[in-house]
């Protein structure tokens, strides 16, 4: 298995990269979250990898973080979710957002990802329930009822998922709903 690549970034054609490792060029497929954080062409890059071996191809997938790679491995274990679909899921939302959607059983958030229909989203919720978070080291994946209410309030006020999640991280655990909303709004006004 190839677990890690360290080399020079030669080409970037989303979602594929070409990485030169001591004269050998590796084609690596990466999620868009990793793609956006890549250095420029000709610069050194380090990727954590997962090799998928099929009858007709060996495909290398690369990730910027261990969390992404672990979630990818969990996703490809699910019936009906192949490596390309798993890559699409990780391109469509961050690991933290995915963990939040799974924890809160929000199939609607998952169906916004291209290639994920209602049945696939429900299968993801069922198969991954309780597996994301502690097992994968995703901080804050388990939401309390208050956290859920605060998040829903921020979304109802028109904030994006990303903005709401960032604001939610500023709210201490155990904070009540009304105080949590006030703290979250205060952190959003500073941004």
From Swiss-Prot:
Family matches, as InterPro entries: DNA_helicase_Holl-junc_RuvA_I, Hlx-hairpin-Hlx_DNA-bd_motif, NA-bd_OB-fold, RuvA, RuvA_2-like, RuvA_C, RuvA_C_sf
**Pfam families reported in the protein's UniProt record:** HHH_5 (PF14520), RuvA_C (PF07499), RuvA_N (PF01330)
What are the boundaries of the region Domain I? 1-64
GO cellular component annotations of the record: cytoplasm; Holliday junction helicase complex; Holliday junction resolvase complex
Q: Note down the stretches annotated as region Flexible linker.
A: 137-141
MF terms (GO), sorted A to Z: ATP binding; four-way junction DNA binding; four-way junction helicase activity
**According to the UniProt record, which cysteines are disulfide-bonded?**
none
Gene Ontology terms: biological process: DNA recombination; DNA repair
Q: Where is this region: Domain III?
A: 142-191
Q: Which residues form a coiled coil?
A: none
**Where in this protein does the record put region Domain II?**
65-137
- List keywords of the entry alphabetically: Cytoplasm, DNA damage, DNA recombination, DNA repair, DNA-binding
Q: Where in the cell is it found?
A: Cytoplasm
Keyword NAD part of the UniProt annotation: no
Q: Which domain of life is it from?
A: Bacteria
Q: Which family does it belong to?
A: Belongs to the RuvA family.
What's noted about domains in the record? Has three domains with a flexible linker between the domains II and III and assumes an 'L' shape. Domain III is highly mobile and contacts RuvB.
Family annotation (HAMAP family): DNA_HJ_migration_RuvA
How does this protein assemble? Homotetramer. Forms an RuvA(8)-RuvB(12)-Holliday junction (HJ) complex. HJ DNA is sandwiched between 2 RuvA tetramers; dsDNA enters through RuvA and exits via RuvB. An RuvB hexamer assembles on each DNA strand where it exits the tetramer. Each RuvB hexamer is contacted by two RuvA subunits (via domain III) on 2 adjacent RuvB subunits; this complex drives branch migration. In the full resolvosome a probable DNA-RuvA(4)-RuvB(12)-RuvC(2) complex forms which resolves the HJ.
Q: Which NCBIfam families match?
A: ruvA
The job of this chain, per UniProt, is described as:
The RuvA-RuvB-RuvC complex processes Holliday junction (HJ) DNA during genetic recombination and DNA repair, while the RuvA-RuvB complex plays an important role in the rescue of blocked DNA replication forks via replication fork reversal (RFR). RuvA specifically binds to HJ cruciform DNA, conferring on it an open structure. The RuvB hexamer acts as an ATP-dependent pump, pulling dsDNA into and through the RuvAB complex. HJ branch migration allows RuvC to scan DNA until it finds its consensus sequence, where it cleaves and resolves the cruciform DNA.
Protein name, as recorded: Holliday junction branch migration complex subunit RuvA
Its gene is ruvA
